From Swiss-Prot:
Name of the protein in question: CASP-like protein 5A1
Residues in compartment: Extracellular: 63-72, 139-156
Stored Pfam families: CASP_dom
Localization per Swiss-Prot or TrEMBL: Cell membrane
GO cellular component, one term: plasma membrane
Transmembrane region(s): 42-62, 73-93, 118-138, 157-177
Alphabetized UniProt keyword annotations: Cell membrane, Membrane, Transmembrane, Transmembrane helix
Family that this chain belongs to: Belongs to the Casparian strip membrane proteins (CASP) family.
Predominant subcellular localization, coarse grouping: membrane
Subunit structure, interactors included: Homodimer and heterodimers.
Family matches, as InterPro entries: CASP_dom (IPR006702), CASPL-5 (IPR045009)
Cytoplasmic side: 1-41, 94-117, 178-180
Amino acid sequence: MMNVSRPAIHPVDALPVAPTAGAIDRPPVRMKDVQGMPGTTGGLILRLSQFVPALISVSVMVTTSDFRSATAFCCLVLAVSLQSLWSLSLFIIDAYALLVRRSLRNHSVVQCFTIGDGVTSTLTFAAASASAGITVLINDLGQCNVNHCTRFETATAMAFISWFAVSPSFILNFWSLATH
């Protein structure tokens, strides 16, 4: 049997290290923190760039009186609402992690972010594509004077921009899971 000292049996007091003169208290740089990952400044900016176009898209679409006339437009409102809630939630989580200097590199957290980004980006892309198709159809039929084609186009474009901003988050998180 080996004589091994356990901290629970023989506690050892750790003396605090005195800071050196002129040293700045910064958290150490972690090599695996790639900008755009959860808990980084780049991730915070990506979440904001996902949230703002999604919010604009849902706001523009809801202010039209006839968006309920096509299922694709209703689907767009639903998908972009989900995207804006998801992005806002993760923006708040990223901001909190940056304020308290916590890492969000936990495997379960990154897996949750990856699945959520994948689901919301797929829904947003599908709804934006369907809305673009209906908008083109309305334009080709020459019914833009009756409908709100400009608003439909704006909402669809903002949904595509939001989807485009989700893609780097999803790819970085998926890459992190694959290399873990």
